[in-house]
């Protein structure tokens, strides 16, 4: 199964759907779904996902290289792993999504969207995670969902963590820093993301990793992701990574800007970078007689997008944590 990506992009079902690797067993579970189980007993389970948005190809290429290293035996596997290529049809077409944004659908929210390939896939992925986690006795559960951003950013690599009722474990946050993340953003409310689903329903330590800018297959400079790739290799092999000398900056979400109608106007242009700062009182958006302004001394924008569908998020506003 050293051609997992090619099979996923072509929509081809392999002739052989399970076999042996170098110190592990593999099972092809469906298009874009591959389970890896070490021969030796382990108590750690990891979801490694990419391609939830089909135009975010660098993380997919990164996972493909990690799989090649595992199959060649140059990388040892010490976790049960479910590899997920989230949206195969959008990946093959080179587009963000075919009908609707899947990363708003998890936790059953797909039921409120018009039926499409994405709603069916979101349901399939929910069931796949349920089966994966329920079939083992993992003491440690992680989910790393790899993305790239539409816009440039003041932080080249950053992580977005779902709302969580319990404190985050220090070793997980330390690993994110060792993986080269320059900033961590903490959600304060539930959402429809893949990582919120795995955290809420299975207690996984989950993070969406944003690793640079979205580019087509073959146009990615994977050297800029080398620190993350090396950290993933060490993680899979059970090798402790050195702590970052500069821990990631921390932010929390303080508000969400939502587009409700065609009257919506977001006062940020296409060159506005993620983590751009705005002073208190700045007008951020208008919709009819509703005005959205900065209420804290300084707020930072994340994922500004004026062209989202009505009812969806047009941006997040953040506050820097000490």
From Swiss-Prot:
A Pfam family this protein belongs to?
AstE_AspA_hybrid
Could you tell me which pathway this protein works in?
Amino-acid degradation; L-arginine degradation via AST pathway; L-glutamate and succinate from L-arginine: step 5/5
Annotated GO biological processes are: arginine catabolic process to glutamate; arginine catabolic process to succinate
This enzyme catalyses:
N-succinyl-L-glutamate + H2O = L-glutamate + succinate
Q: Which gene encodes it?
A: astE
**Cofactor(s) needed:** Zn(2+)
Q: Per the UniProt entry, what species is this protein from, by scientific name? A: Salmonella paratyphi C (strain RKS4594)
Q: What EC number(s) does this enzyme carry?
A: 3.5.1.96
Identify its protein family: Belongs to the AspA/AstE family. Succinylglutamate desuccinylase subfamily.
Keywords assigned by UniProt? Arginine metabolism, Hydrolase, Metal-binding, Zinc
Top enzyme class: hydrolase
Q: Name one GO molecular function term.
A: hydrolase activity, acting on ester bonds
So where's the catalytic machinery, residue-wise?
210
Q: How is the cofactor bound?
A: Binds 1 zinc ion per subunit.
Any idea what this protein is called? Succinylglutamate desuccinylase
